[in-house]
Amino acid sequence: MVVFSKITVVLAGLATVASAVPTGTSRKSTFTVNQKARPVAQAKAINLPGMYASALSKYGAAVPASVKAAAESGTAVTTPEANDVEYLTPVNVGGTTLNLDFDTGSADLWVFSSELSSSESTGHSLYKPSSNATKLAGYSWSITYGDQSSASGDVYKDFVVVGGVKASPQAVEAASQISQQFVNDKNNDGLLGLAFSSINTVKPKSQTTFFDTVKGQLDSPLFAVTLKHNAPGTYDFGFVDKNKYTGSLTYAQVDSSQGFWSFTADGYKIGSKSGGSIQGIADTGTTLLLLPDNVVSDYYGQVSGAQQDSSAGGYTVPCSAQLPDFTVTIGSYNAVVPGSLINYAPLQSGSSTCFGGIQSNSGLGFSIFGDIFLKSQYVVFDANGPRLGFAPQA
């Protein structure tokens, strides 16, 4: 089952109290969205190649035939005991609390809604337009992912509250049709995109993201992400929390011309081997780290037993392998991804073969720095510049 492009956990968090910070004569806000762990009631199936296919198609990359075939065959694993929690983000949308996936790789706020049939909506919290909501006549939205999961529907202007900060009016994309893959994941009720508004998919006119709507209310027009492995993390809006990282932040300029948080890393290191620059996107909505073929080959060339497995839809490694760290150089800063994060998940429950957390970007032309990378870093998404700040997590 594939939910957006994030599978192992539904990354998000529990909105907590927003602290209003006076700045001059105006009141500005900062707030933190804390992730909240929720026990999984039963083992959860994960379509590993489907997850990979979704990440590729999200950016318009061709999905290799072997990956597509593996995704359609439904290769799955059950959630290991060590990973038996999910992290959910309650967000107030039009007066209803929904669990949304925060995604820096997209710019839509779409939700399960009362427009869905009972068979599509059972087990989900549903958006019901508030009494002050306005339906945008003639407006629509539609998304399709690499595993053929899809959703579409109508557009409303309504209010959205995260951490006590209210976006109003905010475009809310209400699902009126949804595929079975989304229906099956009872824990997630939609997505809150945090990329640039220029890539919002609403037709005939794109709409602004939640962040763009509220950034004028924030103490600083930024948010910072601390994702964790097997533990709750946070999203900080309007401020940088110096207690969450060590040393100093290193900034990289962002090229937002394509609507993404795109930056260029100066190089990479794998053990004693090093390589050149990598252009990529910081994406909390993608689980894997997708890199150019030569970098992927460099990495798995140092792992005994690693192989490109067409039946699995990607590179696999022995689950018992001690994988090397992968280091991304940004200026003078070395962002280290521990090898333990790259040994991602067993192909099947009890399998001794694991799916690799680093996979090919399939000739996409840029890399995707997903959660495998982000879980090792404190990352600041700063609209001023724009720029990205990186530091090791405390």
From Swiss-Prot:
Record's keyword annotation contains Disulfide bond: yes
Broad class of enzyme this protein falls into: hydrolase
Disulfide-bonded cysteines: C319-C354
Glycosylation sites: N132
Subcellular location(s) per record: Secreted
Reaction catalysis annotation: Hydrolysis of proteins with broad specificity similar to that of pepsin A, preferring hydrophobic residues at P1 and P1', but also cleaving 20-Gly-|-Glu-21 in the B chain of insulin. Clots milk, and activates trypsinogen
GO cellular component, one term: extracellular region
PROSITE patterns linked: ASP_PROTEASE, PEPTIDASE_A1
Location of the Peptidase A1 domain: 87-391
Gene3D superfamilies noted in UniProt: Acid Proteases
Assigned EC number: 3.4.23.20
Function in brief: Secreted aspartic endopeptidase that allows assimilation of proteinaceous substrates. The scissile peptide bond is attacked by a nucleophilic water molecule activated by two aspartic residues in the active site. Shows a broad primary substrate specificity. Favors hydrophobic residues at the P1 and P1' positions, but can also activate trypsinogen and hydrolyze the B chain of insulin between positions 'Gly-20' and 'Glu-21'.
The protein's name in its UniProt record: Penicillopepsin-2
Organism annotation: Penicillium janthinellum
Gene from which this protein is expressed: pepA
